[in-house]
Every structure is written in structure tokens, then in C-alpha cells.
């Protein structure tokens, strides 16, 4: 999982979902699990 400043590019990838957990924003992608990231 990458820690990134901006999740804007990742949320456009097909299959991406934005999830808020414990005050942090995560992008999870079941179609392409390499595209996981968190912000904050």
C-alpha cells in the first residue's frame, strides 16, 4: 500500500472505491489490488 498526498488519480481507475477508516482515506481496488493507497 502506498501513502500518497493525493488520491485523485487513483480514484479514476476502474474498480476503485474510496473508504474512510479511523480518520484516514483509503482507496481499495478489488479488480486491481496493486492500486491500494491511503492518505494521511
UniProtKB/Swiss-Prot annotation:
GO terms for molecular function: structural constituent of ribosome. It comes from the Bacteria. GO terms for biological process: translation. One of its GO terms (cellular component) is ribosome. It holds the Pfam family Ribosomal_L36. Keywords: Ribonucleoprotein, Ribosomal protein. InterPro entries: Ribosomal_bL36 (IPR000473), Ribosomal_bL36_sp (IPR035977), Ribosomal_L36_bact (IPR047621). Coiled coil: none annotated. The keyword Ribosomal protein applies. NCBIfam families: PRK00831.1. Belongs to the bacterial ribosomal protein bL36 family. PANTHER family: 50S RIBOSOMAL PROTEIN L36 2 (PTHR47781), LARGE RIBOSOMAL SUBUNIT PROTEIN BL36B (PTHR47781:SF1). This is Large ribosomal subunit protein bL36B. It comes from Arthrobacter sp. (strain FB24).
Amino acid at each position: 500500500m502506498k501513502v500518497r498526498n493525493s488520491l485523485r488519480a487513483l480514484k479514476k481507475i476502474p474498480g476503485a472505491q474510496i473508504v474512510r477508516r479511523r480518520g484516514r482515506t483509503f482507496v481499495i481496488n478489488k479488480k486491481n489490488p496493486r492500486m491500494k493507497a491511503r492518505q494521511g
